[in-house]
UniProtKB/Swiss-Prot annotation:
Pfam families the record matches: Papo_T_antigen
Protein name: Small t antigen
Molecular function in Gene Ontology: zinc ion binding
SMART domains: DnaJ
InterPro entries the UniProt entry points to: DnaJ_domain, J_dom_sf, Papo_T_antigen, Papo_T_antigensf
Location of the protein in the cell: Host cytoplasm; Host nucleus
Length: 195
């Protein structure tokens, strides 16, 4: 996500969101901060019109560029539908509802051990499969979070693995707009129908 905004714009967005630099790319936390700051900066609530306009502009650019970064890799072709930018409020967790964590990782031991050869259709395994396909297609490593949302790229971006890495990763993916993941949501819902 380093390529999404210029360094100055990135720092300005984080400053307006009142977030530390290490949270750059954590979409869920950035979105929460955006909502909080929007309430504080809104002109009707006594905030600054200029700051609100700047925040909206930077936030809109950030979201659009992350989406473009992901889709300009060619995508995997799995996605059944695309939402307009206004529909990006539909998070992955909203899409799968109460069963999100069950659909995120169906068989934790199997999914975590069979990194390269899993035929599982949980979100974790599908994102890993995308990683392999995208890297074969592009013939390059993932250097930027946003190109890939697999567990390994998440750990590389946010630091070394910990005991709670799977929970942190599940929460990270939960807040992502479902379109950004480029998943066939039908195969996640209905694993018996997936190829």
């Amino acid at each position: 996500m380093d390529r999404v905004l210029s360094r100055a714009d990135k720092e300005r967005l984080l400053e307006l969101l009142k977030l530390p630099r290490q949270l750059w790319g954590d979409f869920g936390r950035m979105q929460q901060a955006y909502k909080q700051q929007s309430l504080l900066l809104h002109p009707d609530k006594g905030g600054s019109h200029a700051l609100m306009q700047e925040l909206n502009s930077l936030w809109g650019t950030f979201k659009t560029e992350v989406y473009n970064l992901r889709m300009n890799l060619g995508g995997t072709g799995f996605q059944v539908r695309r939402l307009h930018a206004d529909g990006w409020n539909l998070s992955t967790k909203d899409t799968f509802g109460d069963r999100y964590y069950q659909r995120f990782c169906r068989m934790p031991l199997t999914c975590l051990v069979n990194v390269k050869y899993s035929s599982c259709s949980c979100i974790l395994c599908l994102l890993r499969k995308q990683h392999r396909e995208l890297k074969d297609k592009c013939d390059a490593r993932c250097l930027v979070l946003g190109e890939c949302f697999c567990l390994e790229c998440y750990m590389q971006w946010f630091g070394t693995p910990t005991r709670d890495v799977l929970n942190l990763y599940a929460d990270f993916i939960a807040s992502m707009p479902i379109d950004w993941l480029d998943l066939d949501v039908h195969s996640v819902y209905n694993p018996r129908l997936s190829p």
